[in-house]
């Protein structure tokens, strides 16, 4: 339905590359986008990613992901774990943290300046927040038992996470400004995998309080909890769509 074409030339006096590109709608028979980018050789890939973002948004209406970063965990050899980031195409790989003990559950802050993750470096699961510019790491306090699944609120002011500090895995909320921790769920079942709604007023989480893993929603205003899924014996890892109207999750219908 669309054709993307581009032409590249070199400015001899500046050694800059000039890229002219356009997006053509075949069905409508018209140009949708014309663009020009001027770039050095070192930043040519970044410029192409920015062009891809413009083209993607023109076609879909959504923001492109081509200038974003990937964050992932590697276990290249025994007793070696790495938390890395790289460009969307795999280039410019950087190791943010490495440890002889497992690393789990990395998550970006909304502004992309910090990350959270779980590390077992001190013999127990412990949640850390790391500043990407300075590399400074702070622990979310050390408690025995389970400390896992940290996720950032949309405004970057809170972390939801799971802890068994009271004897059973429940969902907690950490205020990054006051450093106050609030307990959100209190049940003898296992509550885990919290996820914020787009407006930050609700949390989706997985619980086996009904006997099998199912998705539940809790209001952070009223603390009212509602069961979301009923079909199947395994529904987990729920995440809200950005529009707040739908969720995506893992479902198993095998009995």
Positions of the model-derived regions?
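Amphipathic beta-strand/beta-sheet edge segments enriched in Tyr/Trp
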Residues: 1-52
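Structural motif
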Residues: 14-18, 78-84, 124-128, 168-172, ...
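Hydrophobic beta-strand positions that form the internal "hydrophobic ladder"
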Residues: 70, 115-116, 156-160, 200-204, ...
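Multi-bladed beta-propeller domains
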Residues: 87-102, 130-148, 174-190, 218-234
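Conserved small/polar residues in nucleotide/adenosyl-binding loops
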Residues: 254-255
């Amino acid at each position: 339905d669309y054709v993307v074409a581009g032409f590249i030339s070199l400015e001899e006096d500046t050694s800059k590359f000039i890229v002219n590109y356009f997006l053509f709608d075949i069905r409508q028979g018209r140009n949708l986008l014309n663009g020009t980018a001027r770039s050095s050789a070192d930043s040519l890939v970044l410029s192409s990613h920015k062009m891809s973002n413009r083209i993607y948004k023109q076609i879909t209406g959504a923001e492109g992901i081509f200038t974003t970063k990937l964050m992932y965990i590697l276990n290249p050899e025994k007793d070696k774990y790495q938390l890395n980031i790289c460009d969307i195409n795999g280039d410019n790989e950087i190791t943010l943290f490495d440890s002889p003990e497992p690393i789990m559950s990395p998550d970006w802050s909304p502004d992309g300046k910090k990350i959270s993750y779980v590390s077992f470096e001190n013999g127990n699961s412990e949640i850390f927040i790391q500043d990407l510019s300075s590399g400074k790491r702070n622990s979310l306090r050390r408690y025995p038992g389970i400390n896992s699944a940290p996720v950032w609120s949309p405004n970057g002011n809170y972390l939801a996470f799971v802890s068994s500090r009271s004897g059973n895995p429940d969902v907690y909320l950490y205020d990054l400004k006051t450093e106050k921790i609030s307990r959100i769920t209190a049940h003898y079942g296992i509550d885990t995998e919290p996820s914020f709604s787009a407006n930050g007023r609700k949390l989706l989480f997985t619980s086996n309080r009904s006997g099998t893993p199912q998705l539940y929603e809790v209001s952070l205003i009223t603390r009212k909890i509602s069961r979301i899924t009923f079909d199947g014996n395994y529904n987990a890892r729920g995440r809200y769509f950005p529009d707040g109207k739908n969720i995506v999750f893992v479902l198993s219908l095998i009995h």
